[in-house]
Amino acid sequence: MLKLLDVHHIAVIASDYERSKAFYCDVLGFTLNNEVYREARQSWKGDLSLNGRYTIELFSFPHPPARVSRPEACGLRHLAFAVADIEQAVASLEQAGVSCEPVRIDPETQQRFTFFSDPDGLPLELYEI
């Protein structure tokens, strides 16, 4: 059996790089570690970290196709982020103009969670730990 060590990063393609960079950095609190414009591909690439750990590779490409359907299309369904206080996290998102679904309780763990979306409609989850 393959012995994976960890998830290294998640790649996200944005339709508007600057808008998504602002969302992930200014709203969600990621840090931009490195950024490069790749002229041959007309594409930005930004490396984002959370709490010092490289997590998201943010890309832009000219005219990317829209996401198929939300959320039950094949492939990646959503990204989930752990938070200590879901009410505070939801309030922070709403203050930044981000709509959240009502907070629910996971029937298996009894933990609270909610969903919201990035600027391109990628489903994101907050999960209280």
Regions found by a protein language model. Name each.
Residues 1-18, 76-81:
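N-terminal beta-strand motif that seeds the catalytic metal site of vicinal oxygen chelate
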Residues 6, 42-44, 75, 110:
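Exposed loop/turn and edge beta-strand positions of beta-sandwich/beta-sheet ligand-binding modules
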Residues 72, 79-86:
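Mid-chain, well-packed structural core segment of small domains
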Residues 58, 69-73:
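Helix-adjacent hinge/juxtasegments
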Residues 12-55, 95:
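Core segments of cupin and vicinal oxygen chelate
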Residues 33-35, 41-44, 63-69, 102:
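A short, acidic/glycine-rich surface segment
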